């Protein structure tokens, strides 16, 4: 569990919080194998036996004061007595992980779900209202997925278009049963329930014995023809192009189908839904005409109109999926408007991921799904953050849903080691921290389940397909941290973690954009940076009448703040906040919202302000980081650059590079080694591109050199982009200072 705070020295009072203008909160990556310093938790048993405070329900930790008969809660100060069992346990403190470490991960006895067959279940739902190219990509992706699945897993193959296809691959020849989707939305469901068409255990096949048959079934998949879709919907062939992708009906039926096995056959089923376009048939169909209309409309802001969901169907369906133990990952492969603003809820609210690929030609989908299945994940998670009594959690951010009864309790359906969540803080009362010498305490409890293989061998030592067993383990992970209140504003500034500040800022601006539009979101970000600059100058300036030209917007006396203007400028230039008029596809904006709101702070900072590294040769690094400007490239005089944008890795050879340097760089050089390591350390597969300046089109690489670009997107300037942005911040900061002097 990694926990990073925006400031390591907390503001001592509400006045100090307002005066510093810094975001106050934490970013939490609960299922990370190590903490933010690289240290693993202390593990053990007894997660169900840790004493809890009678007043605030916090867990006993190594930060608590222990006495012979009891302990004092580190969060609220309540004195709690030990029961007989705890008293006996704590007579041997060395055997109690919670007394020796502030970061523990303990198994909960008897909470593993006795009687539940904890079989890993995976289902592929494939769109057949598609092109041949799309289908070939999906076949490649599913073959990669089969290699990543552990033996003993169950796998089901379903297709959808104007009908649902269920595949039974457990016999010698793949058998498919079709159920037609009614085109009339007023009809009540399918004519035949999926369970009646094919029993669930015939649909779910053991991967270890049926892998070849599953692969054979994939080879039989063909796109449905326009004639076939027209005949099913009762239209003539030339009218069929309007319909044929019954995604909503198919997902609703699949969730109901799988729900019969929840708690008996499986504890969690993961569905991979592959889409080639917007649902346009049956329940949950989406009207994609609103995208075209926004271009031509007058008086309607496309920067606002295309961000909210069109219908609540998929959000409601996600709630049903959660109750059925189903997690859905959506893989959309299309450059057409698909309305991900509506579809995203089915994935992120059921614990899944949303992926978007513009085309099938150079898609990283096979690598992404293999990577997704190869990393460990937890499910059925409950995340709870508690604080000491002087402050409390305010807003919470991330792909979870709040508990309907308890505050600051979030439920996470499926969580991997990259998934990150955020909280901001507020004071409980106007006095702030009542005793500035005492540390503020944050405790994060994360209860989760994992499936662990427990192989059984036959008498002769061989492993039969039926002998793969899995056990369901319930665990409790607790992290307790202390933060000292700052004595003054300068201490707060000196303790800032700019990546975490950006992390919470991005969460806030995403919500603002969905609610009020991209323009308002951009305004909010610019206004915050201007306020931060004004507050910084007010704190450090001895003369309140500081002239405008003397306002320090580079935070020259505080290294921890110096990267923030660049990060904010890059955020405003990112597709997340670029205006619709610049050609940002609304689905791509939604994809970035979903991706960015799940990233940990360092990855998010890289996605917002990419890392540019120079090399003097493929085997020698020249400089670890440059600003994103053409001037930086010219001044460096290095011939080779590696640009890491998180989603892309671009190797750029300048036109002046030595012709003897091999292009692309050889696989055994330092540059390639660096690339391979970067690809391994992230949740998605970055797309690798090689560009030779002077010979290849350099537009992609140059588009990331943002510091010469106008922040409002009016076009490239002669180099005044970031400079002009700084001046605009200086002007607004000066106005804030003058207004407060006048008042």
Regions of interest found by a model, annotated:
Residues 1-743:
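Extended acidic, low-complexity intrinsically disordered regions
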């Amino acid at each position: 569990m990694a926990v990073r705070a925006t400031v390591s020295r907390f503001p001592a009072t509400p006045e100090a919080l307002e005066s510093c203008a810094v975001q106050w909160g934490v970013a939490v990556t609960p299922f990370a194998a190590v903490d933010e310093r690289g240290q693993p938790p202390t593990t053990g048993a007894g997660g169900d036996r840790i004493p809890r405070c009678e007043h605030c329900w916090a867990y006993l930790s190594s930060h608590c004061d222990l006495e012979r008969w009891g302990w004092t809660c580190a969060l609220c100060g309540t004195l709690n007595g030990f029961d007989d069992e705890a008293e006996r346990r704590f007579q041997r403190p060395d055997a109690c992980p919670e007394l020796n470490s502030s970061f523990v991960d303990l198994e909960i006895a008897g909470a593993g779900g006795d009687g539940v067959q904890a079989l890993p279940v995976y289902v592929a739902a494939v769109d057949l209202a598609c092109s041949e190219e799309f289908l070939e990509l999906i076949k490649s992706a599913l073959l990669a997925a089969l290699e990543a699945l552990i033996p003993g897993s169950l796998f089901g193959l379903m297709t959808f278009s104007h009908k649902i296809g269920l595949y039974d691959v457990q016999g010698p020849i793949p058998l498919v049963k079709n159920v037609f989707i009614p085109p009339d939305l007023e009809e009540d469901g399918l004519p035949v329930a999926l369970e009646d068409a094919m029993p669930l255990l015939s649909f779910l096949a053991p991967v270890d014995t049926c892998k070849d048959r599953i692969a054979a079934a994939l080879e039989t998949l063909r796109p449905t023809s326009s004639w076939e879709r027209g005949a099913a919907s009762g239209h003539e062939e030339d009218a069929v192009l309007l319909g044929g992708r019954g995604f909503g009906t198919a997902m609703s039926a699949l969730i109901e189908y799988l729900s019969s096995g929840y708690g008996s056959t499986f504890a969690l089923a993961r569905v991979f839904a592959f889409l080639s376009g917007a649902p346009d048939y049956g329940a949950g169909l989406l009207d994609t005409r609103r995208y075209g209309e926004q271009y031509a409309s007058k008086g309607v802001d496309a920067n606002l109109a295309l961000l909210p969901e069109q219908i609540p169907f998929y959000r409601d369906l996600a709630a049903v999926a959660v109750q059925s133990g189903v997690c859905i990952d959506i893989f959309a492969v299309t450059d057409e408007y698909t309305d991900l603003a509506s579809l995203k809820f089915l994935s992120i609210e059921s614990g899944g991921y949303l992926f978007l690929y513009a085309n099938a030609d150079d898609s990283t989908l096979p690598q992404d799904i293999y990577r997704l299945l190869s990393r460990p994940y937890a499910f059925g998670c409950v995340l709870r953050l508690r604080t000491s009594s002087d402050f409390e959690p305010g807003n919470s951010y991330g792909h979870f849903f709040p508990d309907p009864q308890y505050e600051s309790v979030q439920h996470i359906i499926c969580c991997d080691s990259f998934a990150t969540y955020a909280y901001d803080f507020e004071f409980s009362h106007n006095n702030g921290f009542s005793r500035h010498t005492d540390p503020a305490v944050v405790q994060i409890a994360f209860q989760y389940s994992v499936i662990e293989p427990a192989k059984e061998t036959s008498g002769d030592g061989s492993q039969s397909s039926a002998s793969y067993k899995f056990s369901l383990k319930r665990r409790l992970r607790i992290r307790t941290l202390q933060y000292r209140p700052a004595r003054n504003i300068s201490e707060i500034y000196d303790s800032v973690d700019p990546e975490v500040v950006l992390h919470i800022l991005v969460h806030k601006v995403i919500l603002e954009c969905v609610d009020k539009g991209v323009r308002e979101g951009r305004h909010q970000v610019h206004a915050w940076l201007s306020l931060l600059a004004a507050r910084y100058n007010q704190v450090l300036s001895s003369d309140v009448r500081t002239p405008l030209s003397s306002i320090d917007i580079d935070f020259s006396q505080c290294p921890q703040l110096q990267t923030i203007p660049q990060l904010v400028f890059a955020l405003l230039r990112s597709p997340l906040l670029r205006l619709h008029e610049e050609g940002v596809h609304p689905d791509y904006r939604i994809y970035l919202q979903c991706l960015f709101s799940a990233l940990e702070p360092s990855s998010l900072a890289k996605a917002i302000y990419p890392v540019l590294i120079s090399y003097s040769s493929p085997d020698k690094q020249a400089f670890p980081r440059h600003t994103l400007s053409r001037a930086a490239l010219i001044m460096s005089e290095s011939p080779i650059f590696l640009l890491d944008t998180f989603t892309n890795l671009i190797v750029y050879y300048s036109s002046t590079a030595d012709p003897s340097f091999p292009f692309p760089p050889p696989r055994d050089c330092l540059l390639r080694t660096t690339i391979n390591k970067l690809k391994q350390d992230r949740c998605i597969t970055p797309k690798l591109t090689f560009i030779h300046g002077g010979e290849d089109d350099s537009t992609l690489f140059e588009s990331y050199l943002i510091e010469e670009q106008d922040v409002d997107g009016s076009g490239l300037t002669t180099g005044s982009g970031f400079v002009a942005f700084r001046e605009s911040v200086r002007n607004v900061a000066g106005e804030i200072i003058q207004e407060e002097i006048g008042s």
